[in-house]
From Swiss-Prot:
GO terms for biological process: photosynthesis. It is a peripheral membrane protein. SUPFAM superfamilies: TPR-like. This is Photosystem I assembly protein Ycf3. GO terms for cellular component: chloroplast thylakoid membrane; plastid.
Amino acid sequence: MPRSRINGNFIDKTFSIVANILLRIIPTTSGEKRAFTYYRDGMLAQSEGNYAEALQNYYEATRLEIDPYDRSYILYNIGLIHTSNGEHTKALEYYFRALERNPFLPQAFNNMAVICHYRGEQAILQGDSEIAEAWFDQAAEYWKQAIALTPGNYIEAQNWLKITKRFEFE
């Protein structure tokens, strides 16, 4: 049974209904419809914290989805799950792959920056300030890219960049 038929959350049900209507009225191939169904089911599973099920659906969606823009969001969501699971190297890989297909994903740049910043903090705890600075510099570069795409967002990152003198804003 498709996940959309077993979900009890009102918002998820509403999303599923709208998605099903769109699948019927928008001219798409059967492969694109199947890819979207897997993507939708992956999002529903992810929203419930069922990450293994979400990953299965996302992997199947990436196998079927041919549009680079749509694939970017699938890859981004896979990155989110790996981030949540503490698998930062895998998460970075999927964020990179998403950005290769869609360079206008500020949230991917932000998440990559957060991972790099975390790694910088871990390096400080291990007493390696040189490695920490390299991670912080990389985080700054990713945050600058996210901020360039959405200047009004990522205020905490903007403040960190100012405080650490890694970026000057007008």
